[in-house]
Amino acid sequence: MTILTFTLILFLGTFIAGLLGSLTGLGGGVVVIPLLTLLFHVDIRYAIGAALLASIATSSGAATAYVKEGITNIRLGMFLEIATTIGAVVGALIAIYMPTNTIAIIFGVVLIFSAVMTLRKKNEHALEGGSPLAEKLKLNSTYPVDGQKVPYKLTNIVGGFSLMGVAGVLSGLLGIGSGSLKVLAMDGLMKIPFKVSTTTSNFMIGVTAAASAVVYLQRGYMDPGIAFPVILGVLCGAITGSKLLKKMNPKTLRLIFAVAITLVALQMIYNGVQNKF
């Protein structure tokens, strides 16, 4: 395979990754890492390094549009980033010394969890009574629905903050942004409307990934030949996805995505058990 062919295939694959990451709030890494390791046989640590950069690109591309539309809760995102950033650095340091096959198995398990999370019932309603802590931290906000701003309130701030720390560790360890856990924390525990939790997750993923990427960069796990087409493809896909989100019902997409991700996850787990990484 020539360098040009490799670059074009990688660009197309990561374009799809960015598109799906933007539409589902999971980040492009859930597709980028299996693509690099299973198809191109790239060392999983280099794949994680590229995926972290891809997550930054996905977050940047999608988050810009969502912030302009007033959907993203920026104050909440920056508050929760305290937990995820600390967790991300810890996870990245663990990944440096953990066997690659073990990382692959954990990655597969988290992918299956992510697939299940995409199919769960989403919270589309704004909570009327929030917690005093959310009020004190000024985390309650509004989001646009049919041209009107709908207020919503948050609950279980401590539980959501704690789960964000776990999401940060997995992000640093696996390079996938841990969007599913972030959405679970905001949508499931804190009772934020799903569209707000998805867009805020996209906003946060880039900051979390940047913290992890520093560790991988210092250890030499960033290859420009891999990273450049990955960043370009994911960024283009993320921008496209942010425009499509307003015009489509993503339920069918989530179902197809969940099935595909589950198959990829099983392959990752199998290869990890067979010591093929």
Task: Locate the predicted segments by residue.
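Juxtamembrane transmembrane-helix boundary motif
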Residues: 1-17, 38, 44, 68-168, ...
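Transmembrane alpha-helix interface/packing and boundary motifs in multi-pass membrane proteins
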Residues: 14-25, 62, 164-174
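Juxtamembrane transmembrane-helix termini in multi-pass membrane transport proteins
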Residues: 24-82
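Short hydrophobic/aromatic, small-residue-rich stretches within specific transmembrane helices
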Residues: 51-55, 201-205, 226-227, 231
